[in-house]
Amino acid sequence: MRNSENVLNSLAGHSQNPNYKFERLYRLLFNENLYADAYQMMSHKTGNMTKGTDGQTISGMSVKRIQSIIAKLRDESYQPHPAKRIYIPKKNGKQRPLGIPAFEDKLVQKVVQMILESIYEGSFEKCSHGFRPHRSCHTAMASIMEGFDGTRWFIEGDIKGFFDNIDHDIMIGILSERISDERFLRLIRKFLKAGYLEQWTFHHTYNGTPQGGIISPILANIYLDKLDKYIVEYISKFNKGKARKRNPEYKRIASRKDKRVRKLKAEKDEQKRRALMEEIKFHHREMQKLPATLDMDEDFRRMRYVRYADDFLISVIGSKEDCVRIKEDIKIFLLEQLKLQLSDEKTLITNGHDVAKFLGYEVTIRNTEKTSTAKGAKGLPKRSLDHKTVVRMPMEVMRKKLLEYGAMQITVKNGKEVWESTSRPVSYTHLRAHETLSDL
């Protein structure tokens, strides 16, 4: 029996060839080592101790049970239990359905997830950050901070009811582009059609992935990788020009400053040198008040994109008309190719200097004419952080968290709230609060 690490590494190696078709995946599900590794990865997670519809938890694992599962898979008599569906509250007051699979289904899903991840992870786009190894909401926000400087417009994307509106036939069709194994694809379809339990009544599902299911994240990323690749190609056609044109006024003042710098180098008279230095400082201050390049340059456009699960944020250096067209093109692609709807009420076009929201954070572009008080090596004021990307936690969220962790207390003075820190955090809860806020 092959070592599970070798099995998965072999899959990952073959996946580097985009034309390679995987033909014998189903037989990998007969490898007991994969289940043993899956169990090790799942056993320490508290959520896996929640009872599924079969009333069992993963703590009852045994080799005999694994062999029983494999026997059912061999003759294809294995049938996933309907997922126990519970509802968790959302911020907008609505509820999000969460499916809790039965124990056996959790284990089989984990093995399937390991196989799919080995095949697809290497081909996913860099712009995708949700539910992937070594990626998180923090890497998504870091990529925004590093790559969204100078944004004129944001497009805040939201796909309506994504997890419950995945088309099963399209999902299987996408998988079949790389997987030529009918038994493996039939197993995926069984999970998709497993249905759910709502108030302990069985209902049948025709769309959607089991959101509490272990394979939901990888299936979602495989499905939305089509969107990622469409937008990456769109960006390559949209982007135009090597750099923004220089601001003529900035260029004129810079030319005057440069002339005086050249004179200063050749001037020997100390009094004239001081006068030239004052003029240089004056022109430098004037330059600090102006953008070095034109904000609107018809010959320069840029578009950038970050996705986390079904939420995405697009940065546009261009016109608002460009954004309207981009939004409409994405809406058409989602509807025609993936049978998904872009939420008009949540997909907003936001000015770069206003606040866009993504993953609970506020994203904006700094806009100030103030010059920094710090000075550079030559004693001249440094340029301020104009047009830089700013990511921050909403003030109300910060207030709530600090109070929740007991990291501050609020007093009211002269009708205004005053935030005061408590003593240095020493408890585990306080330390976790400190670490959480530091990460943000």
For each of these PLM feature ranges, what is it?
Residues 1-432, 438:
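Non-catalytic terminal/accessory segments
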